Amino acid sequence: MSDNCFCRQAVTNDAFALSDLLTQLGYPDTADFMVSKLNAIANDAAAVCWVAEINQQVVGFLSLHIIPQLALAGDFARISYFCIDETARSHGVGKALLQQAEAYAREQRCDRMEVHCHQRRVDAHRFYVREGFAESPKYFIKML
């Protein structure tokens, strides 16, 4: 299936498809603000969002942010959202999006990439390890 996979930058017309994918991840009701979020990413030089299409249908997306580091020579890239349609998983779509993100991060002079993944997403954990990610033991969050 990955031979038919085409990656491109997301546009506002992708809002409905991305909302559907986020619902699969457990984030319902994103349709009302998805267009404004995609516009914000499009206008942020440190952010990008790609979609993966098969037969002109969006089957996945990945959003990435470049984060400058003061104490290190290289910056790092953070995957903020990464979702593949349940019907398209294990067919190379995620790998294609990740390769797109890695190439872009290298162009931006990043020397590492990170992703936060909920502990219940065991299949995603296996994917990340297979793609060369190492588990990082601590992550703290404070709601504002």
Language model: regions and residue ranges:
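Short beta-strand-to-coil "C-cap" segments at the C-terminal boundary of structured domains/repeats
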Residues: 3, 141-144
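Acetyl-CoA-dependent GNAT
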Residues: 9-74, 80, 143
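Conserved functional loop/turn residues at catalytic and ligand-binding sites
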Residues: 45, 83, 92, 109, ...
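Residue-level recognition of the GNAT/N-acetyltransferase active site
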Residues: 67, 85, 118
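Conserved acetyl-CoA binding element of GNAT-fold acetyltransferases
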Residues: 74-86, 138
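Conserved acetyl-CoA-binding loop-helix of GNAT-fold acetyltransferases
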Residues: 81, 90-103, 130
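Conserved active-site alpha-helix within GNAT-family acetyltransferase domains
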Residues: 95, 119-137, 142
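Conserved GNAT acetyl-CoA-binding A-motif
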Residues: 98, 105-117
